[in-house]
Amino acid sequence: MTTPDRLLQLRQQLQKASYAYYVLDAPVMEDSVYDQLYRELQRLEAENPELITPDSPTQRVGEQPASQFRSVAHNIPLYSLENAFNVQELQQWQERWQRIAPTIEKAEYVCELKIDGSAIALTYENGLLVRGVTRGDGTTGEEISQNIKTIRSIPVKLNLDNPPPTVEVRGEAFLPLEEFNRINHEREAQGESLFANPRNAAAGTLRQLDPKIVHQRRLQFFAYTLHLPGQEDKIQSQWQALEYLKKAGFMVNPHCQLCKGLDEVVAYFEDWEGARQRLPYMTDGVVVKINQYPLQRELGFTQKFPRWAIALKYPAEETPTVVKAIEVNVGRTGAVTPLAVMEPVQLAGTTVQRATLHNQDRIQELDIRVGDTVIIRKAGEIIPEVVRVMTELRPENTTPYIFPSHCPACGSPLVRPLEEAVIRCVNSSCSAILQGSLIHWASRNALDIQGLGEKVVITLLENRLVNSVADLYGLQVEQLLGLERFAQKSAEKLIAAIEVSKSQPWSRILFGLGIRHVGQVNAKLLSQQFPTVEKLSQASIPDLEGVYGIGPEIAEAVVNWFRNPGNQQLIQDLEELGLVLANQGIDQTKTDSGKLKGKTFVLTGTLPNLSRLEAQELIEQSGGKVTSSVSTKTDYVLLGDKPGSKAAKAESLGIKLLSEAEFLQLLEP
């Protein structure tokens, strides 16, 4: 594709996306995709300035507003913000404004969380709200005053004794995550399409023709910009403006911070990059503003951006890339998982080349093909996944992907059990299943065998030294010498680590066996109720379902596992090799075990695996107790995702915060 053709394609794609976003409130492109395409357009135009056209998105502020509401011109334009995607680009921004104002040796910065919502402009006359307008294209928006007045965090009357004749306030209307989830649940129950994210939901809500619907959806508003026409000298800094807004009755984000230099800005950004998951609303970066208004006025604006502010964005959690191949992976349970092999991209701070496609149904639903441009997403610690195929960019002559009918590792026919989405290899001798079983057995949360990672497991299998996890305990140093990665010392260390693993507790061994649906938490629950492998192997489905947290699917999987003759032989082999498949000297069904005796816990947030009841059960079974509020008598706060104020109070009191993994380690015998 020639450069002029690529420029034309980029302009058309960005204009279409901009129109859908600003006018229709129906985005067709993720922010990270738009950013990437926009930066490519900027680069190509900088390299080929003769090809710049007046209608290019780089030469415009936005699109025309929709016609459903009355159009209103903004007295002062609502500019976009320039984006920085790393600290280096932030430093370059500072260098640029310093060249414009060389006499300024040092500036203060105000850092504000970049709320993922919808910008609106409010006008007050003599203290009363007279108009609310959407951002629109930055110069003209839509009047939505009736809807604005339903937002409780926006004052209808300013809390000022002698308000100025005119006050203009800008800020972000947004939906808290809890409210967003409630709305989507209601829409799902009514058969309506779901909002893709809280920002889309906020924008769509503001443009509802019926104010009653807006009122029901409980939007909130953070104010961040103040204009006092005719009284500009009254406020001399952004920090002073925020204080004024709070005094006037507006909600200002409580996490704003005044920074003395760029180092403090970077520290603020890094702190919130990790802590933002605790917030009850979405944020995708930090807005950095020069604090001093005189310096802001000296720097002024470009055609699109204020020179005195920039948005420092968090690493993308969604980004586009191209599919190079589709492979399938056979796991330790025989599950066959398709993976997309892609052009390497940066995603959430890491380089990503593979993403899960989950199963055959998902491939068919996406109609993903080799050569497609796709959007991949990464949330938390999970493996990246493909969430959308950009079919508008699909090359010609692509063909649908055909799922394999035979196992790529052993050649056995693949089967799809009834009522399951996962296709499986059911050959118990499959090399891929054995490899996954060995890796799982040695993993940190199971037997924790140091030095026995994937590459070593592959080496052992290729040299036919092991055929089950039991074979690990018969390995000798002499067998390892001469193999790739092994010398005398490394061989001795691995054999010693395998020997040490024999003393791991029953719950870890149970988890390491790899029974379907029996994760770390369920293994802990089962080991407490059935303190020996004999008792567990003899348990019926009703016995297992009687354990708190164990449902019929898990119970059936456990019973079926112990009925398998090969698994019965494995248990016998492990016991003969010296592993103790029982709780050693401790009856963990009794609360006098003392592991947490006398300890007081408070639970907050959503845990990755445990429910609150399960966590409380484990604490009480181990002699501890759970209370509802944090005090000086609290020993631990068990912290999940999106915790409330309890986490902050615990930190202020110096109380230890525990993740779920750290909590489970406390329960280890």
Curated annotation (Swiss-Prot):
What Gene Ontology terms for biological process does this UniProt record contain? DNA repair; DNA replication
Which reaction(s) are listed as its catalytic activity?
A: NAD(+) + (deoxyribonucleotide)n-3'-hydroxyl + 5'-phospho-(deoxyribonucleotide)m = (deoxyribonucleotide)n+m + AMP + beta-nicotinamide D-nucleotide
**Cross-referenced Pfam families:** BRCT, DNA_ligase_aden, DNA_ligase_OB, DNA_ligase_ZBD, HHH_2, HHH_5, Nlig-Ia
Residues forming the catalytic site: K114
Q: What is its EC number?
A: 6.5.1.2
- Which Gene3D superfamilies is this protein grouped with? 5' to 3' exonuclease, C-terminal subdomain, 6.20.10.30, BRCT domain, DNA ligase/mRNA capping enzyme, Helix hairpin bin, Nucleic acid-binding proteins
Q: What family does this belong to?
A: Belongs to the NAD-dependent DNA ligase family. LigA subfamily.
Quote the HAMAP family the UniProt record gives. DNA_ligase_A
Q: What is this protein called?
A: DNA ligase
Q: What's the gene? A: ligA
